[in-house]
UniProtKB/Swiss-Prot annotation:
Component of the elongator complex which is required for multiple tRNA modifications, including mcm5U (5-methoxycarbonylmethyl uridine), mcm5s2U (5-methoxycarbonylmethyl-2-thiouridine), and ncm5U (5-carbamoylmethyl uridine). The elongator complex catalyzes formation of carboxymethyluridine in the wobble base at position 34 in tRNAs. The lineage of its organism: Eukaryota, Amoebozoa, Evosea, Eumycetozoa, Dictyostelia. SMART domains: WD40 (SM00320). One of its GO terms (biological process) is tRNA wobble uridine modification. Keywords: Cytoplasm, Nucleus, Repeat, tRNA processing, WD repeat. GO terms for cellular component: cytoplasm; elongator holoenzyme complex; nucleus. This is Elongator complex protein 2. The gene is elp2. Component of the elongator complex.
């Protein structure tokens, strides 16, 4: 049997850090996602690959320009190297795999030298092909690294020279967090700018006494003017090759927490400039410039009027404040110039003076000097004028400067395309990738397997579905339309105020879920009518007429945690109030039927007990909004505000935070657990779905029950716990007062906490996986004879087992018991597929063989929390392909295709 796998879909948000995103000339964008790098194509709106290597959060990424012509031809790319830095104190050099796809990279070198988190890196390429890199760190140092140019041996063997640390600059007690490198205009002498937790920008220049091979830098000056910490620095050379007699000038853009952007111009100090500005040289290389302007602006303390002079190779240069850009209302985290590009017709290098800044005021601004006056103006402003987002952390231009890509506080991306078809150009929002920005704890396919929902400690439930549309390409043969299918987030059923831990679908009901978080109550939600219609438009999922009357949409009040149902003007909710009020204003118990009392009967708010009807919550009226039925995946703003599911019930009873929840296959019972440190707390509560009431409280454990699993026939309930044992309960007769009775507990069935349990498709076996690196498979027929109940123990794994999941039934795998497939996830991100055969020595036992291990290049990097098989595999001739969806503490959700030949 030949088994292979590939990744079909990756969803992960960007790290919540400033400037953690880059877009290269090779058309690939790279961003930090937990402890790995994600490479994606913004135009296709798809994450192509992830690069594992770091042990902690990735803080900054930088593409390395490829100036070697042979390498350019070999890789057909301007960039085929990448540098990244992390909170694990290291810098990693990445290189594109020879002969691989343009998004397949490997680790070339791990640079160690810093003693604390590395916060920023910048790189400069010399004409001879050598490289200079600057790294800043929380250890209060800045390190300079050098790499020699490629040799013939490097090119022949497809290797790279080693990086060497050539200088360490100590800034104790200050910490530098950003840097930028450039050449002094008209020379190949490097200039370094660093900034950090102080209002100064420190400028360093190469010590001309040092050799080219042992570059050493000396401090030139400190630029003053900002009133708060420096957040981002970026150099740009202008006037390069633009007409005869034009002198090169260098502009340094700096952004700060003082809400301002400053542009510093570095150019040769000519006699003409001296005559025009009448510079009066005075100490520290400074000069009192623009005296008249200073007098006029005496009340503006943030405008520096000082010019800075320095000598380089007997040539005098001056640094002048060129402009102060004021347009943001909060910290400016990121500043980037538009990239240089080649004119397709003339081949000339075009470097537009265009700048983009990203701020915590939720906007990104495109700045450009006015063509007539030369004054810098905010040409365009993109972002969110309201809503729930908390600001932009970074923004970059595409290689052609026709697109803007930004990332925000909640890990979300925002993508705009410039539309120049109109008289005045404007930026249109585009569909872009999305994902969690915190550990993903749970996920599950919908009962019909048309979509899945993931649950994260970033306090959101996210719903992903296939976007099915036709490719209207006129070049297709016979003009037949080809269907394109991609996975996208189309709804966000819950945005909570607590970290979400678990959820489950209610089987036999359409679009109904129950979630649990770090609070003592659970909440039930129903898909809105807008969601049902949107799912039909985007995924072609036909609605099921189950008699459920759905609210049009949901809205979350400003100070509430409940998703309030939203109806049209003539809703049943309003009619219910009117009918009850008209019924003699009496409820039959001598109490007046006021509007308030009816609202409380329909569910109440967060303060009271849950009723049996629709839980509207009693809050002040919200600002009206217009829910939309969409025909394509929504933007982040819509997901945040208009894709919530209405809350229909709250479950009260648990004394601590909810940990696990599960629903029986027949949809009759719901089981839930909470954090526990004693037997009284470690109970499993059973709820009757028909009336949402608690009907049993099952005992059997002494510590937290971390996972619950019903058998496919709904007859058994399996619980696994921190107390290192599992417990099995059996469904009672329908006329019994107790719906479930305990069958057996297995003390010390594992040596460490048991994280997961799963039933085989025929319910004859169940598997348990634990931190003791073992997976055990138990035979239900022998379950009461605990000594002989273990049908098999898989070989010890390399790390703790965090989840196990049996595959659904397939005709391809048959045997006396029906051969089984089992997926196992570990706490290092590894996923393996195992196949069973009936043991020849014991018919009631199973022998297991590992048939496939998903490649680390596409797999997770941290704990795998859930693995879910899609119900129906795809059969093509003799091959069979399953889909599994997985989630991890590494913030990512992935879909893998597992192909059996």
């Amino acid at each position: 049997m030949n088994v292979s796998s590939d990744v079909d879909f990756i969803s992960v948000g960007c790290n919540c850090l400033g400037d953690c995103l880059v877009w290269g000339q090779n058309k690939l964008a790279a961003y930090g996602a937990q402890n790995f790098i994600a490479l994606f194509d913004p135009i296709q709106s798809k994450v192509l690959a992830t690069l594992p290597g770091h042990k902690d959060r990735v803080n900054h990424i930088c593409w390395v320009p490829n100036i070697n012509e042979e390498y350019k031809n070999r890789y057909s790319s301007y960039e085929n190297e990448l540098l990244s830095c992390s909170s694990d104190n290291t810098i990693i050099s990445w290189k594109q795999i020879k002969g691989g796809l343009n998004y397949q990279y490997k680790v070339v070198e791990v640079l160690k030298g810093h003693s604390d988190s590395v916060t920023n890196i910048s790189v400069l390429d010399f004409p001879d092909g050598s490289l200079l890199m600057c790294s800043t760190s929380a250890d209060n140092t800045v390190k300079l690294w050098r790499r020699e140019s490629l040799t013939k041996e490097n090119i022949d063997t497809d290797t790279l020279p080693k990086w060497e640390c050539i200088q360490t600059i100590d800034f104790t007690p200050k910490c530098m967090e950003c840097s930028s490198l450039a050449f002094i205009p008209g020379t190949t002498i490097p200039l370094l700018a660093v900034g950090g937790l102080e209002p100064k920008i420190h400028i360093y220049i190469q010590n001309l006494d040092s050799t080219t091979a042992t570059l050493q830098f000396k401090k030139l000056m400190s630029l003053q003017g900002h009133q708060d910490w420096i957040r981002s620095l970026s150099f740009k050379t202008i006037n390069e090759g633009e007409g005869e007699g034009e002198e090169e000038e260098l502009i340094l853009a700096s952004s700060s927490q003082d809400f301002k952007i400053r542009l510093w111009k570095i150019s040769k100090f000519t006699a003409e400039k001296q005559k025009q500005q009448q510079l009066d040289e005075s100490g520290n290389g400074g000069a009192n410039l623009l005296g008249s302007l200073s007098t006029q602006l005496s009340g503006v303390t943030s405008l520096s009027t000082k010019g800075y002079l320095f000598n380089c190779n007997s040539v005098k240069y001056i640094i002048l404040l060129d402009a102060v850009l004021s347009g943001h209302d909060d910290w400016v985290y990121s500043i980037h110039w538009s990239p240089a590009r080649r004119d397709q017709e003339t081949g000339k290098k075009i470097q537009e003076q265009m700048l983009i800044s990203a701020s915590m005021d939720k906007t990104a601004i495109v700045w450009r000097p006015d063509r007539t006056t030369g004054i810098w103006i905010d040409e365009s402003r993109v972002g969110d004028m309201g809503g729930n987002i908390l600001g932009q952390y970074g923004a970059v231009f595409s290689p052609c400067s026709q697109y803007i890509l930004s990332h925000g506080y909640n890990g979300a991306f925002h993508f705009w395309k410039q539309n120049t078809n109109q008289k005045s150009s404007f930026w249109e929002p585009q569909i872009v990738v999305s994902g969690h920005f915190g550990p993903v704890q749970d996920l599950m396919w919908s009962p019909d397997y048309s979509y899945f929902i993931s649950c994260s400690t970033d306090r959101t439930l996210r719903l992903f579905s296939e976007w099915k549309r036709n490719n209207n390409n006129n070049n297709l043969e016979n003009n037949k339309e080809q269907q394109i299918i991609s996975w996208n987030e189309i709804a966000r059923p819950q945005i909570h105020g607590y970290d979400l831990e678990c959820f489950t679908f209610i089987n036999k009901k359409t679009h109904v879920i129950v979630s649990g978080a770090e609070e003592k109550i659970m909440r039930a939600f129903v898909g809105s009518q807008n969601f049902v219609d949107t799912l039909l438009n985007i995924s072609k999922v036909q609605p099921v007429n189950d008699g459920t009357q759905r609210p049009l949409a949901a809205n979350q009040p400003s100070l509430g945690l409940s998703n309030k149902p939203y109806f049209t003007g003539g809703s049943d909710y309003n009619e219910n109030i009117d009918n009850n009020n008209n019924n003699n204003n009496n409820n039959g118990n001598g109490e007046e039927n006021t509007e308030d009392s009816i609202k409380m009967k329909m569910g109440g708010g967060d303060e009271g007990g849950g009723g049996e009807g629709m839980d509207t919550g009693y809050f002040e009226d919200e600002i009206p909004f217009n829910p939309e039925v969409l025909s394509e995946p929504p933007f982040e703003e819509h997901l945040l505000q208009s894709s919530l599911w209405p809350e229909i019930h709250k479950f009260y009873g648990h004394g601590n935070e909810i940990v696990a929840v599960a629903c029986s296959a027949d949809g009759m019972y719901l089981a839930s657990t909470c954090r526990a440190s004693s037997a009284d707390q470690a109970t499993v509560r059973i709820w009757n779905v028909s009336n949402w009431k608690e009907c049993a409280n099952l005992k059997g454990h002494t510590l937290t029950v971390v996972n619950l699993s019903f058998s496919h026939n709904s007859k058994y309930l399996l619980g696994v716990s921190r107390d290192r044992m599992w417990t099995l309960w059996e469904r009672s007769a329908s006329n019994s007062e107790e719906p479930f009775v305990k069958v057996i507990s297995a003390p010390k069935s594992h040596g460490r906490i048991i994280w997961s349990g799963s039933w085989s498709h025929d319910d004859k076996f169940f598997a348990t996986g634990a931190r003791d690196k073992l997976v055990k498979v138990w035979n239900l027929d022998n379950i009461k004879d605990i000594k002989n109940a273990c049908a098999s123990t898989l070989p010890a794994f390399g790390s703790g087992v965090t989840c196990v999941e049996f595959a659904p039934k397939s005709s391809k795998f048959t045997g006396e018991h029906g051969d089984h497939l089992l997926a196992v996830g570990e706490d290092d991100g590894k996923i393996t597929i195992w196949k069973s055969t009936t043991s020849t020595s014991n018919p009631k036992s199973l022998d297991w063989t590992c048939v496939h291990t998903i490649s680390p290049l596409i797999s997770h990097t941290l704990d795998v929390r859930r693995i879910r098989w899609r119900d129906t595999p795809t059969i093509n001739g003799n091959s069979l392909t399953y889909q599994i969806v997985t989630c991890s503490v590494d913030h990512s959700v992935r879909i893998f295709n597992i192909k059996f030949d």
